[in-house]
Structures are given as C-alpha cells and as structure tokens.
Amino acid sequence: MTSFGIIVFPGSNCDRDIATVTAGLLDQPTRFIWHQETDLHGVDVVVLPGGFSYGDYLRCGAIARFSPIMTAIIDHANAGKRVLGICNGFQVLTEVGLLPGALIRNRDLHFICDRVTVRVESNQTVWTKGYQSQQVITLPIAHGEGRYFADGDTLKALEDNEQILFRYSNAQGELTTDSNPNGSLHNIAGITNVQGNVLGMMPHPERAADRLLKATDGLAMFIS
C-alpha cells in the first residue's frame, strides 16, 4: 500500500480529481492535508494539485510557497521521499526551490485547455517505470502560465542529468514547434530534481486515469 497526502491550498481545484484516482480507482490510503497543517506523518507520496492557489496573486505559486505545510514538504523531499506537483503544484515546487526554473506566461498569452501528446524520456525513475522509454502518451493540459523557462546553465544541467522526464511531442515522438503548446524551452513538460524523487509536470495525469473516460495514459504515474 502507498499512502498519498494531497495538499489543499485556498484555490486548489484538482485535489478531489487526484483522490478519485488514488482512493477511488486504486484503493490506496489517501488524505487531504490543509495548507496550514505542519505534519506529513504516515504519508509516502505528497501531491500538490492543480488549481489557482491563493488566486495566483503576485505570481502562480508565489504565495503558496509560504504556507506552513511547505516546511514539512521540503523535509519530505530532502529525505528522498516522493513529491509530485501537477500544474499549479509544479509552479509551487519551482517557487519554493525544490525544482529549478520557472513557469511563465504561455507563448500566445492565452489559457490553453486541450489534450496533448507527451514523450516519456525515460522509464528508469520511480514515476515512469510503468511506461516505456520514448513512449508517447496523451494527457490533458489546462494552464495559462505553463511555459517552462530557465537559463542556459540550468537547461544544460537538466539535459546532462537526465532530469527532463516529459517533453511535448507529436504522435510520432518528434519534438516540433507545432507540438509544443506553450513555448516551453526544450519542449519541457515535466522535470525532476537530481535525485529523481521530486517531479513537477504541467499535464494532468489524474485526468487520464479512468477507463470510463476512455483515457488511461496517466494511471501508471500513480501506480509507479
């Protein structure tokens, strides 16, 4: 059994979607953790869900990084335990420094709600062992500030350390401008920390995990 702790900030709106997968579909112990709590006792995997934490005031994730629960999340990550940030959760992880870079306004400055094809770069991680390396999967996206940006040295380190776990691609797995929905540098859709236990991604695997929706490409993320 894997115990999931789903962080709930003011403005989170994908927390119950994740619980539907972890508790409803997979029957794993799951609890909601309000952002003012300070204890992650008994939690194996921390999930920071999508949404608009604190209304995205100042900058996406900029206020959530100061929530009391973040100290415990940082300790959890530094202990080598798993932390997953999806969409707004990814933004929070960059703001708090658990992942490098930043998520900025989409290339066309519009909110994007669509399904995209994403290439799994490696299956040699705890998050992707249920996939094949270079496998192309389809996942939903819904964001206005999902364009990954980092300086040249950071991008080189991400490439050299194989921290880029997901890239936007076409159905054949080719990295093209047309298949990059938001202008992310290096077609980045998701990255890990150097140790590989912290993952941030803009696509929503929890929205592609139920056979009733005829979309299950994201389910392996939660089984891994």
Swiss-Prot record:
Gene3D superfamilies: 3.40.50.880. It comes from the Bacteria. SMART domains: GATase_5. Residues 4-224 form the Glutamine amidotransferase type-1 domain. It catalyses: N(2)-formyl-N(1)-(5-phospho-beta-D-ribosyl)glycinamide + L-glutamine + ATP + H2O = 2-formamido-N(1)-(5-O-phospho-beta-D-ribosyl)acetamidine + L-glutamate + ADP + phosphate + H(+); L-glutamine + H2O = L-glutamate + NH4(+). Its EC number is 6.3.5.3, 3.5.1.2. Pfam families: GATase_5 (PF13507). GO terms for cellular component: cytoplasm. It is found in: Cytoplasm. Keywords: ATP-binding, Cytoplasm, Glutamine amidotransferase, Hydrolase, Ligase, Nucleotide-binding, Purine biosynthesis. InterPro entries: Class_I_gatase-like, PRibForGlyAmidine_synth_PurQ. Pathway: Purine metabolism; IMP biosynthesis via de novo pathway; 5-amino-1-(5-phospho-D-ribosyl)imidazole from N(2)-formyl-N(1)-(5-phospho-D-ribosyl)glycinamide: step 1/2. GO terms for molecular function: ATP binding; glutaminase activity; phosphoribosylformylglycinamidine synthase activity. GO terms for biological process: 'de novo' IMP biosynthetic process. PROSITE patterns: GATASE_TYPE_1 (PS51273). Part of the phosphoribosylformylglycinamidine synthase complex involved in the purines biosynthetic pathway. Catalyzes the ATP-dependent conversion of formylglycinamide ribonucleotide (FGAR) and glutamine to yield formylglycinamidine ribonucleotide (FGAM) and glutamate. The FGAM synthase complex is composed of three subunits. PurQ produces an ammonia molecule by converting glutamine to glutamate. PurL transfers the ammonia molecule to FGAR to form FGAM in an ATP-dependent manner. Part of the FGAM synthase complex composed of 1 PurL, 1 PurQ and 2 PurS subunits. This is Phosphoribosylformylglycinamidine synthase subunit PurQ. It comes from Synechocystis sp. (strain ATCC 27184 / PCC 6803 / Kazusa). The lineage of its organism: Bacteria, Bacillati, Cyanobacteriota, Cyanophyceae, Synechococcales.
